[in-house]
Curated annotation (Swiss-Prot):
Similarity section: Belongs to the bacterial ribosomal protein bL12 family.
Annotated protein name in UniProt: Large ribosomal subunit protein bL12
One matching Pfam family: Ribosomal_L12_N
GO cellular component: cytosolic large ribosomal subunit
InterPro entries assigned to the protein according to its UniProt record, in alphabetical order: Ribosomal_bL12 (IPR000206), Ribosomal_bL12_C (IPR013823), Ribosomal_bL12_C/ClpS-like (IPR014719), Ribosomal_bL12_oligo (IPR008932), Ribosomal_bL12_oligo_N_sf (IPR036235)
Species the sequence originates in: Alkaliphilus oremlandii (strain OhILAs)
Keywords linked to the UniProt accession: Ribonucleoprotein, Ribosomal protein
Recorded GO MF terms: mRNA binding; structural constituent of ribosome
Length: 121
């Protein structure tokens, strides 16, 4: 197995599977995956900020060209005409959940091009 294949296998694992993998590696090799304590580190109570990896795309409103927005929503979500119209009429509405930053930005660009107001959370 190449390093690339191993990384790909790890990338496709769920959180629970990764946790089990870490525990198994700790037991097998007699090591600990916990971070070492640093003297003089960040002030207690300071939040460690993790980089967000999954994003939600929220349609805030359809703007003036509602028909174009409905067409784009159908294209992006695979919804039928009625469901896409209901999603647009029901704004603010989350259209996509748990997508990568790149995909979220592409979706946002397409919707904004059609005239919609969109946020990525």
């Amino acid at each position: 197995m190449t390093i690339e294949q191993i990384l790909e296998a790890i990338e496709n694992m769920k959180v629970l599977e990764l946790n089990e993998l870490v525990k198994a590696a700790e037991e097998k090799f007699g090591v600990s995956a916990s971070a070492p304590v640093v003297v003089g580190g960040p002030v207690a109570g300071a939040a460690v900020e993790e980089e967000q990896t999954e994003f939600d795309v929220v349609l805030e409103n359809a703007g003036a060209s509602k028909i174009n927005v409905i067409k784009v929503v159908r294209e992006l979500t695979g919804l039928g005409l009625k469901e896409a119209k209901e999603a647009v009429d029901g704004a603010p509405k989350t259209l996509k959940e748990g997508v990568s930053k790149e995909e979220a930005e592409q979706i946002k660009a397409k919707l904004e091009e059609a005239g919609a107001a969109v946020t990525v959370k």
